[in-house]
Amino acid sequence: MLGCSDDPGPGSNAPDAGAPSDPDAGAPDGSPPSSATFGPLGDRPDLPVDGRLTIDGLLSAVDVVQDRDGRPHIYAENLVDAMRVEGYLTARDRALQLEILRRTAEGRLAELFGDLDPTTIDQDIALRHVGLGRIATAQYDALPAGELRQMLDAYADGVTQVFRKIRSGDILLPGGATGIPAEAFTDWSGVDSLVISRFHSYLLSFDAELDITMQQFFDAARSTFASSSADPLAQKRAGFERDFLRFAPSEPAVTSSGYPASPAREKARKAEDKAAKRASRARRPDRAAPGRAKLLSSLTGYLSAVQRARSKVAPEGFGSNNWAIHASRSATGHALVASDPHLSLSAPAVWYAVSIHVTAPEGKDASRDVHVGGVTFPGIPGIILGHNEHVGWGATVAMYDVTDVYAEKLTPDGKAVLFKGNPVPLQTVEEVIAIAGREPYTYRVPIVPHHGPLLPNIVDHAVVDPDPAVGALSVRWTGLEPTKELEAIFGLLRARSVDEAQESLSKFSVGAQNWVMGDAAGDILWTTHAAIPTRSREAFAWDAATYTGVLPCMVLPGDGTAEWTGTLPEHLIPHAKNPPAGYIATANNDPIGDSLDNDPSNGALPDGTPMYLGCSFDIGFREGRIQERIDAHEGPLSPEDCAAIQGDIKSALGARLVPHLLRAMDRAEEERATPGTHPDLSGIVADAAYDPERLAAQRALLDGWGEEADYKAAAGVDLDTGMPLADEGDGPGAIDARASEATLVFNLWLVRVVRRVLGDELGQMGFSSFSREMSAKALLHLFSADREQLATFDPAVQDSALWDDMGTPAVESRDERVLRALLDALAWLDRQGGSGAAAPRWGAFHTVTFDALLPLFSSLSIPPPSDPLWSRGFPRGGDEFAVDSSDYRLSWALDESPDFGYVHGPSQRLVVELDPAGPKAWNAIPGGNVWDAESPHFRDQAELWRKNQTHLVPFLLPDVIQAKESRTVVEAP
């Protein structure tokens, strides 16, 4: 279902529902205004004024029409006034979120919570080292005096006016918001907005943790499973890293196969410069060097702190989908744009919904008029994702590698690094962290001039100076310099075509995105413009056959041999316009296929020089499924079709892995019927837990999952009552019920088989867990690759040694592990109880709760722990790598209950039709626009979101009037 626009939703006459105690909000009873002043909408009988609000600094009166979803529509005569009002309204509805985001980004959380939670000190240290506040200050200082700076300042002033009312007690914080005193809401500034903007770029593009973890993994794998090991079990696993860590996507779906090619590029793909590789290998330090192991392990505190910071917006597994449909493939004859970025599912939502309409007074220059709607990150003025009258746009993270970590050699006094054989003095910046309940902590951040800051060794909530004998790690990131992202975003507001939008985005440098867009002329376009570093050949001295050498997604030598040489030329940054397929889709996937051969190092530019975009692209299932749905669609696509694709919950892993599970079950039955047929399974079939009748029923269930439901990961519960759907019959509900039972069995099996197959090796290496995506790719590789081509192939068993459990004297086989994991899953189901109609359903365990930003605010979670129906969260369909993202964290437990809840997913579900007569947009955000449990707009959109429904978003004035909840005239005192 695409729209639910017939239901006006819960209404309120109060024009300031998010802050009912604001004394300047005006009369909420619809009484006549106290003066004849009106905003740009004038005196209209179909749009009576419900209240008035005074804001300092306005040049002209502004109208705010709040619709039935709590979305403000701002009508102003100039953009500066509009930004001032947007800042005010955002602070009115999201004050707590603004303050927490600001303090997180600037590294000032400990000032409030350091006594209650000392880990906030570590988090502040980690973010101060990167210096987002320093970068934002430099960025603001570099802004010329003009409209952009005026808009930033006006937005900041609007926020400040609300914060001052909070400090004075004229506006009260929402109930349940404990632990933050009113005086903490200090005045806002343009720098604060820029630091929040850079914080989001940091979360979506800074990946030093990945480089460090990757290097730790490689070092541990090579030292633990060396071919020279005296332990035969370890020796058989030599090459473990090649089977576990796969750079190629499991589903080889790319956005564009038409990237510029040339004979030189193809030649370079097949044979890199061998001399450069040999030369750099001669200089390469020993990958298992104890010194580096000590250096990497010293960053445990830093890595934990960064993980906590990321959880606010982009936890592990974040991603996004978007696509654009050309008018020629659209059922409406107009271009369509779909956008569902997958970010943290929190309360409040990460996005704030708003529309902005700027119309110059009659007789004035109308060339600067703006009519735009969509969503923005609270704290950032304007609109980030959405549409104007002519163009609609969405974005997904491009996953380009724009961060490098360098192993620095220090001089004996620790005050300089060695670079190209010469000492280069470290620069330092003093940081003072205020901490609640104790004295401030003062320390200095050391910075390598040609790379960036040294990453901190955090011990007992303080920074330990690096040991010169061990060295240090520095980080270089494209976001360490001032750039012009906000200018690029504001340019989109006035773009009249996809070409103008692309030109505006040419100013976008940090936090690379796959921007897809469509316009009223029917054209579509994709661009990934960003500052993408080019690197010297020595940074790619990698042998894909042996997994040895140097890659930018691991730790690079800091001696000057693996440096950045510039940025990728603009015309070579992946992009496309109006492709022959009639659509463009992205999902954090490899855009051009450079990693499909599992070698991220051998790409080349048309002239044959190195070309590298990254080595951590998505596993590929979402992109593949989106393309499959669009390609298979009979006839043109409608907005409803796009919404249905956004809600697709086919289990990608189920479709790939269930056939292997069924084969193992068949082989077990063959062994039971004729002992000795498959002797590796004799122990399984003799196990008391092996019940042939039950296994046959499970086999039929899993087989039917594919046959009748195409591996749909259905919730299997009534989304209004939470009761399980009946599983008998042939109706859609019964099919969903059976599919949900199969989904639960499969995912229980999945977490067990990952643990039983890979947990012993990872444990030997010192890892209690690892990336769920890497684990899934490894499992798929073990199942699907030619066995003899596996690095861990054991001739004695004609299969990978990884199937064998290192902790037992027996030699377990592939099928034994598969079936043992299934018995684990069934034993867990037995402990849950229920059968038939009462059998456990996937939706009872696969749930989502929009957790409040801080545990202190748990009563502001959606649903709260006290919710009478959904205390465990909303039941949801989907599973790992589904288009409708709902990835849980792979559990390593064998006996304890796995946690199938999830914390990230679609942060909006936007579909835009670019009709020349006026755009139409449908959307829903997870939660509501106002973070106040007393507001009717606290969780109203959550009811749509959790059922994969959206509503028609009013944009044209007649639609806004029809959806009106209140009109407020905002004017200067």
List the predicted regions and their residue ranges:
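Ser/Thr-rich, Pro/Gly/Ala-heavy low-complexity intrinsically disordered linkers and tails
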Residues: 3-37
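Substrate-recognition/specificity elements adjacent to catalytic centers across diverse enzyme folds
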Residues: 32-336, 341, 347, 359-361, ...
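Gly/Pro-rich active-site capping loops and adjacent beta-alpha segments
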Residues: 81-122, 126-135, 394-442, 558-619, ...
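Second-shell loop/turn segments in exported
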Residues: 82-86, 134-152, 476, 486-492, ...
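Glycine- and hydrophobic-rich flexible loops that cap the catalytic core of alpha/beta enzyme folds
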Residues: 356-382, 386-556
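Hydrophobic alpha-helical segments
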Residues: 510-633, 709, 735, 741-767, ...
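Terminal end segments
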Residues: 596-678, 795-973
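Charged, long alpha-helical assembly modules
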Residues: 715-825
